[in-house]
């Protein structure tokens, strides 16, 4: 009897080293894509540019711009509206960031859910 348990399955063509090398290449490609996404910034804008929120490609909030003169803070409703606009602008920017991430990670994202260090949405 042979020492190779895979010979019974057709000649023992299973190459663990090749599989590990492929996994390492995929990990490097994923890391590179995530680095590019971290450096990419998208804007979410509402109310004709009254509020603009900047989010990087991994969904991190990196800036908020409020157009001068739009809100003086004297009316409590203005402040409430401002909060709502910031949230809406963030959602817009985050949707764009998610779309970018989907494009950038594409085939690399397949099967990555549940891997250590990549929970749920690849850590985003």
UniProtKB/Swiss-Prot annotation:
Pfam families reported for this sequence: YbaB_DNA_bd
Which keywords, in A-to-Z order, does the entry hold? Answer: Cytoplasm, DNA-binding
According to its record, what are the GO cellular component terms? bacterial nucleoid; cytosol
Q: What is its main location?
A: cytoplasm
Which compartments does it reside in?
Cytoplasm, Nucleoid
Query: What GO molecular functions are on record for this protein?
Result: DNA binding
Which HAMAP family does the record match to this protein?
DNA_YbaB_EbfC
The entry assigns this protein to a family as follows:
Belongs to the YbaB/EbfC family.
Query: What is the purpose of this protein?
Result: Binds to DNA and alters its conformation. May be involved in regulation of gene expression, nucleoid organization and DNA protection.
PANTHER family in UniProt: NUCLEOID-ASSOCIATED PROTEIN YBAB (PTHR33449:SF1)
Q: What is this protein called?
A: Nucleoid-associated protein Noca_0318
- Provide the species name: Nocardioides sp. (strain ATCC BAA-499 / JS614)
